[in-house]
């Protein structure tokens, strides 16, 4: 047996293919005890990976394949642009915290250059014995040192003899010194020489490097470890991953094949030549690795403690003399006096009283008093500055407490709105309390100022925005697949995708599909419901199979739906934490604003205890304020 320690998910954007749950299913099928996640330059997939592994009773190990530059990362010279790879794993909870610090540091604006990066000396500041590292694949500096100045030539060598002839004369001295430097940085027993042989037939330099590292291991005592370089779960997924690579490289599979046939160099060529970047079976690994190298993978897994990064939501304290529970009750009493007592018929007072009593009992049992006080404070800041907040969006308008304390302006009883649609305590478990979701609509022009106020109140380092990912969905997935293979005109692509709806337009139908089958697909829904319009290209037969001229492409697009494609800053989400954000989650660089944002998605933020508040900039509120201003001035329109 062995333990896969080098695996990428679709959080390695347009490079890794598989979703965390697909990785977990593959590991379970192979009878392995767990798996490590080592995405390129980020740990954004860690929380969803832990959830997936937990569901399948498997051990998750959290790691990252870091980008290492040769000089200090603040240097942006040409000679410091090339990056080497280094894999690090968290041994324990302290190691996870160090991993957060490392990835946050590499994402600082002064260090980020095309990729998040650090020099080895910068990285060493975070190595306190709680991180395990191994040298990396052919993209590592150790592999580079084996060949010296001829490394690029060696990595494209076609035969073992050619690659071996390009080994640097001083390889032994230079490689030994570098390996010992790594060993010193990470601490005795925490550094391993990584042996990858998955593509030795296609990439003979891989075999040369493995031979060199095995020799260094005997010379220094630094152990070797066998790893895959998994970019997808199963061998059958290779063709799907190539679609991602084509989107990344802005090319097509026919173009790549033509260049390879002509002997031209192609970026990421081995991915197009090989189907071996999957999670191998133990039998596959035993064919190419020594027993000791496989046993060391299990040894490393055993060195990594089991720890839990998931936790209950932690609300930041809201300053109030009488405590949040009594303060919220008093605000409800004040709201009653202003909005109910003399404005609602007495015959209905009991209905209102029963409703507010029930809501307070539910909300305060769940420990949510501070949440409502924080939201109210934000809304009050908007009003106190003479700006216009929204009256209440979505299910939050069904909460009488929100109306009484001034978060919303809508009486839920008057309009027959249901509290349980806003907050259902039945979703709470002993492990987790469900958080409410109140969207605060604010003028677009004032949103940044409002966020600055929140930062000033709770602490600059405790407030931040978060990342969101764009995924391949429906139309986009079809277009990515068709572009990758070529042969379809732009006009025909648009004609096809015209009959595939947006995900949001069929959200309820997709939910029903998921409840019935465990999966949901916009494309599949379109084939089942717009069959006549798509018949020229693809259709579903009586047995549920996909048929037609473009059946294979549609099937591929269905498989790719939901795959991460790009990242950006979330349009509305703001998190407020009782402790500095960079102690709880990785901070990544928003390349547009050059500002750090939380490097986890909304659901993942909540799963590690962060509280998310939606502050939505609404342009219509700016326009209404503009009209009010004109009317106040008495300007003739």
What is each model feature region?
Residues 1-637:
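Alpha-helical scaffold/interaction cores of sigma-54-like transcription cofactors
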């Amino acid at each position: 047996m062995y333990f896969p320690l080098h695996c990428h998910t679709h959080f390695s954007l347009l490079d890794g293919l598989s979703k965390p749950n697909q990785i977990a299913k593959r590991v379970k099928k192979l009878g392995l005890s767990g798996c490590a996640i080592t995405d390129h330059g980020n740990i954004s997939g860690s929380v969803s990976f832990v959830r997936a592994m937990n569901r399948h009773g498997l051990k998750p190990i959290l790691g990252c394949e870091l980008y290492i530059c040769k000089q200090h990362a603040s240097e942006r010279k040409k000679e410091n642009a090339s990056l080497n790879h280094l894999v690090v794993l968290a041994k324990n909870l302290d190691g996870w915290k160090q991993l957060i610090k490392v990835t946050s540091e590499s994402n600082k604006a002064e260090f980020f250059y095309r990729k998040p990066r650090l020099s080895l000396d910068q990285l060493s500041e975070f190595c306190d014995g709680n991180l395990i590292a191994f040298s990396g694949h052919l993209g590592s500096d150790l592999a580079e040192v084996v060949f010296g100045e001829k490394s690029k030539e060696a990595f494209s060598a076609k035969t073992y003899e050619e690659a071996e002839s390009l080994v640097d004369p001083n390889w032994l001295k230079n490689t030994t010194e570098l390996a010992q430097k790594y060993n010193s940085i990470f601490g005795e027993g925490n550094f391993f020489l990584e042996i990858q042989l998955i593509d030795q037939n296609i990439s003979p330099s891989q075999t040369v490097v493995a031979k060199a590292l095995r020799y260094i291991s005997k010379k220094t005592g630094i152990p070797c470890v066998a790893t895959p370089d998994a970019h997808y779960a199963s061998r059958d997924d290779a063709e799907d991953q190539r679609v991602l690579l084509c989107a990344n490289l802005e090319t097509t599979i026919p173009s790549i094949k033509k260049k390879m046939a002509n002997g031209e160099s192609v970026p990421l060529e081995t991915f197009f030549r090989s189907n071996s970047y999957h999670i191998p079976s133990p039998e596959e690994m035993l064919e190419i690795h020594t027993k000791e190298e496989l046993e060391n993978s299990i040894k490393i897994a055993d060195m990594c403690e089991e720890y839990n990064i998931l936790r209950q939501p932690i609300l930041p304290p809201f300053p109030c003399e009488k405590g949040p529970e009594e303060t919220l009750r008093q605000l409800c009493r004040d709201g009653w006096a202003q909005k109910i007592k003399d404005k609602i018929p007495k015959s209905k007072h009991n209905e209102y009283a029963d409703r507010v009593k029930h809501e307070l009992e539910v909300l305060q049992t769940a420990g949510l008093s501070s949440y409502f006080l924080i939201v109210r404070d934000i809304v009050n800041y908007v009003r106190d500055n003479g700006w216009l907040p929204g009256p209440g969006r979505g299910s939050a308008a069904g909460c009488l407490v929100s109306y009484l304390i001034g978060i919303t302006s809508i009486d839920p009883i008057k309009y027959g709105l249901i509290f349980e649609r806003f907050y259902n305590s039945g979703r709470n478990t002993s492990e987790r309390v469900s958080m409410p979701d109140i969207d605060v609509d604010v003028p677009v022009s004032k949103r940044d100022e409002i966020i600055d106020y929140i930062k000033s109140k709770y602490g600059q380092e405790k407030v931040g925005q978060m990342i969101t990912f764009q995924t391949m969905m429906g139309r986009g997935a079809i277009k990515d697949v068709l572009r990758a293979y070529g042969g379809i005109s732009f006009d025909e692509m648009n004609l096809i995708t015209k009959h595939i709806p947006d995900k949001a337009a069929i959200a309820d139908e997709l939910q029903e599909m998921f409840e019935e089958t465990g999966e949901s697909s916009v494309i599949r829904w379109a084939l089942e419901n717009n069959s006549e319009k798509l018949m020229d290209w693809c259709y579903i037969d009586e047995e549920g199979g996909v048929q037609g001229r473009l059946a294979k492409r549609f099937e591929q697009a269905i498989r790719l739906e939901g795959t991460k494609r790009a990242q950006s800053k979330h349009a509305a989400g703001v998190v407020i934490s009782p402790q500095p954000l960079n102690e709880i989650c990785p901070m990544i660089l928003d390349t547009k604003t050059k500002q750090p944002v939380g490097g986890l998605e909304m659901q993942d933020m909540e799963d590690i205890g962060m509280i998310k508040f939606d502050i939505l900039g609404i342009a219509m509120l700016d326009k209404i304020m503009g009209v009010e201003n004109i009317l106040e001035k008495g300007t003739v329109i």
